[in-house]
Amino acid sequence: MSDNITKLSPAKINLYLEVLERTSSGFHNIESLMTFCDFGDIINIKKEKSFRFTIDGPFSKNLSLDNNIINKSVSFVEKLLNKNITVHINLTKNLPISSGMGGGSSNAATVILCLIEMYKLDCKEDFHQSLFSLGADIPFCFFRKSALVTGKGENVLEIENDYENFFVLLINPMIEISTKKIFEKLTIPTRKDFTPFNEKFLCNTKIINFLNSRNNDLEKEAISQCEEIKNILDVLKNETNSLLSRMTGSGSTCFALFRNKEDLINAEKIFTKKFKTFWVKTTKIVNSFETL
């Protein structure tokens, strides 16, 4: 049993996110092609005599130690083990809060993954489904592979693809947006010409055309709450060589895909010059991380 585990808790991006319907229970059924970046928060877990949870990093200041999804994740694993967990969990928070990059969900999933590895827990077949009770993005974040996510987030289908060589620019205006408010005010679009997802779109020559034909249905409502999102997207579309530019999740982070590093760096320079208070990060798509 390893007594000290450190893992990247990667940022996720929704390459597209379409809301198909609102269910009678108040949830929303979606279709989203989701992937990861090679940047994110860092989770370190060490065996100790009692439980401790600490947070550091550039975005640690406004995070609560008590009301945090990591504590819920620990309780989730304790129920599976039927014993108390005595570890020190340290979260290094590198991602902005409430940014649409799945930070909290990725943190929770990574903690669960580390604890399963540390305690050599044998997961049951329905384990992935039970993760949904912690949060809609957690099944995908635990899966740690590019996937088509449907239903309310509980259905995660691995996608074989060859677009890992895309470079990514992430931009956040440092304005938090409430996912709950976005969905409460969302008007679900009517789709006359809906193109079902097909894996044949996933080669480099076709994926960009396919993605540009899809949307993030949360973008319009997010812009009504944060006009800076529109400003970011306008610059990405009109002043850079981006292949795709879009908001991820419920915002306020936007991303753009680039074919080469030169275009990526040029776009980064534009944003650091125009928007000095924004968070800007260069990274790459990663199709999969180590899992169980």
Which residues does each PLM region occupy?
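ATP-binding N-lobe of GHMP and related small-molecule kinases
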Residues: 1-99, 116-122, 160-164, 172
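Short, basic/glycine-rich phosphate-binding loops at helix/coil junctions
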Residues: 49-64, 111, 132, 205-216
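Conserved, helical-rich catalytic subdomain that frames metal- and/or nucleotide-binding sites
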Residues: 53, 143, 148-244, 259-272, ...
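Phosphate-handling active-site elements
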Residues: 78-88, 114-134, 260-273
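DPxDG-like acidic metal-binding loop motif
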Residues: 99-126, 140
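Glycine-rich beta-strand-to-loop/alpha-helix junction loops that act as flexible
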Residues: 103-104, 247-252
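Short hydrophobic/aromatic beta-strand micro-patches
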Residues: 255-257
